[in-house]
């Protein structure tokens, strides 16, 4: 019997406007649990705008209007006022590593402390588990009190991933998490993403076609604020349905 993948997030008829300018048009997408979904497309196509709707980061921008429905486990994220709880459940890792100017330990403990956790044993456990989960524990375990700003770019990005998973999210959003990293650091983060999907649902924006092909289970191709094609990654990269998808992934435009 074929197992049916559980839908973790569902997007229905999503429109987004910046003032009068429409940036996203009628987006429909089911994001499967414990899978990596890649968002690809040329610069300015709407993929970063889209990923930020998934944990309401666009709420911070003035003059934004959002129509349609986005749900996590069947619950509409835009009908609740509890944005903090949403961002606990749906974590985010940004393009440029952005560790806080504090120790490695305090970076990872920041979220749990903000939510009221003060017990040192529990914090120690969360910090260690999160750093192990982000595949950086062995590199930093002897210098947890050192500043996170003293780490390499690749290490800083893994600290940011550890900081995200310290909140025990269910979904991790990644907006071009390796674009500022060297090839070796990129490979480490890609290996980490492959490992993380056992416990988390991951949505990643990437400009790198090879990266999308390597690490994702499903891929959505965005163009001019629309999803042109959304399918399992192997199908998209071998037998795309839409000519525009084929033109993009073969490098005819971008």
UniProtKB/Swiss-Prot annotation:
Q: Which residues form the ABC transporter domain?
A: 9-249
One GO biological process term is: phosphate ion transmembrane transport
Which of this chain's residues are annotated to bind ATP?
41-48
Provide GO CC annotations from the record: plasma membrane
How does the protein's chain sit in the membrane according to the entry?
A: Peripheral membrane protein
Q: Which Pfam families match?
A: ABC_tran (PF00005)
A GO molecular-function term, please?
ATP hydrolysis activity
Keywords linked to the UniProt accession: ATP-binding, Cell membrane, Membrane, Nucleotide-binding, Phosphate transport, Translocase, Transport
Q: Which reaction does it catalyse?
A: phosphate(out) + ATP + H2O = ADP + 2 phosphate(in) + H(+)
Q: Where in the cell is it found?
A: Cell membrane
Among CDD domains, the record links this protein to:
ABC_PstB_phosphate_transporter
Q: Which domain of life is it from?
A: Bacteria
Q: Which SUPFAM superfamilies match?
A: P-loop containing nucleoside triphosphate hydrolases
Annotated EC: 7.3.2.1
Role, per record:
Part of the ABC transporter complex PstSACB involved in phosphate import. Responsible for energy coupling to the transport system.
Family per UniProt? Belongs to the ABC transporter superfamily. Phosphate importer (TC 3.A.1.7) family.
**What interactions and quaternary structure are annotated?**
The complex is composed of two ATP-binding proteins (PstB), two transmembrane proteins (PstC and PstA) and a solute-binding protein (PstS).
Q: What is this protein called?
A: Phosphate import ATP-binding protein PstB
State the species of origin.
Clostridioides difficile (strain 630) (Peptoclostridium difficile)
Upper lineage? Bacteria, Bacillati, Bacillota, Clostridia, Peptostreptococcales
Instruction: Give the gene symbol.
Output: pstB
């Amino acid at each position: 019997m074929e197992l049916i993948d559980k839908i973790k997030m569902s997007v229905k008829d999503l429109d987004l406007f910046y003032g009068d300018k429409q940036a996203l048009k009628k987006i429909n997408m089911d994001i499967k649990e414990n899978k990596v979904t890649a968002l690809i497309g040329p610069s300015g196509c709407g993929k970063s705008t889209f990923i930020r709707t998934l944990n309401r980061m666009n709420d911070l921008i003035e003059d934004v209007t959002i129509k349609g429905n986005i749900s996590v486990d069947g619950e509409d994220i835009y009908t609740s006022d509890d944005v903090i709880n949403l961002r606990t459940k749906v974590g985010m890792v940004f393009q440029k590593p952005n560790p806080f100017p504090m120790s490695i330990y305090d970076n990872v403990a920041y979220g749990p402390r903000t939510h009221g956790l003060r017990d040192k044993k529990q914090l120690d456990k969360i910090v260690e588990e999160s750093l192990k989960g982000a595949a950086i524990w062995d590199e930093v375990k002897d210098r947890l009190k050192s500043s996170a700003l003293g780490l390499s770019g690749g290490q800083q990005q893994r600290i940011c991933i550890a900081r995200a998973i310290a909140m025990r999210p269910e979904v991790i959003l990644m907006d071009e998490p390796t674009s500022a990293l060297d090839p070796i650091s990129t490979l480490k983060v890609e290996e980490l993403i492959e490992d993380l999907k056992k416990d988390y649902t991951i949505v990643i924006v990437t400009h790198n076609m090879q990266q999308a092909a390597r690490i994702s289970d499903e891929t959505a191709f965005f163009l001019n604020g629309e999803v042109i094609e959304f399918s399992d990654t192997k199908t998209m990269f071998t037998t795309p349905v839409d000519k525009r998808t084929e033109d993009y992934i073969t490098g005819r435009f971008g």
